[in-house]
């Protein structure tokens, strides 16, 4: 009896979560995206970097996989409508950086920013992206 109630509760939660998700569909097209980011720090602007990444609704946070960035962990990802927010923490390879980001998708493009602290310096990374085609 308890097992049947537990299964019923689980199925009810899955149905509820599916209905909530369907009602707040993200306006974003899965596929390969070209992402341009520019880091700004006090007294310094770093030239823009462009990279490509396969982005999906399930994995909607742009991640630059440059050398030294592979120990970064994204957490607290939240989606509200077409806006995705997240936190990121990087280990020693990336200089113990931590930050928070937010981007808003508009179908085949997005814009947003990430604020972070790296080695005691505050940084703002402005990001924009455009879908270039399907993922390989």
Identify the residue ranges that each predicted region occupies.
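N-terminal helix-cap/turn-to-beta initiation motif at the start of protein domains
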Residues: 20-32, 78
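Bacterial N-terminal signal peptides that target proteins for export
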Residues: 1-9
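Short beta-strand segments that buttress and anchor functional surface loops
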Residues: 35-37, 85-92, 112-118
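Bacterial N-terminal signal peptides
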Residues: 8-18
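Tryptophan-anchored aromatic micro-motifs
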Residues: 28-42
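Edge beta-strand at a domain terminus
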Residues: 118-136
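Short, surface-exposed coil-to-beta transition loops
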Residues: 48, 95-100, 111-113, 122-126
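Central antiparallel beta-sheet cores of small beta-barrel/beta-sandwich binding domains
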Residues: 47-100
């Amino acid at each position: 009896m308890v097992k049947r109630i537990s299964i019923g509760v689980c199925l009810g939660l899955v149905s509820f979560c599916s209905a909530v998700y369907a009602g707040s569909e993200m306006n974003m097209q899965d596929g390969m995206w070209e992402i341009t980011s520019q880091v700004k720090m006090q007294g310094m602007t770093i030239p823009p970097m462009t990279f490509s990444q396969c982005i999906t609704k399930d994995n909607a946070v742009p991640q630059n996989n440059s050398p030294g960035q592979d120990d970064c962990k994204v957490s607290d990802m939240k989606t509200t409508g077409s806006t995705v927010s997240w936190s990121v923490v990087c280990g020693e390879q990336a200089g113990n950086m931590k930050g928070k980001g937010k981007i808003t998708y508009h179908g085949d493009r997005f814009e947003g920013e990430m604020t972070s602290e790296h080695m005691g310096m505050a940084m703002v990374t402005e990001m924009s992206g455009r879908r270039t085609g399907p993922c390989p």
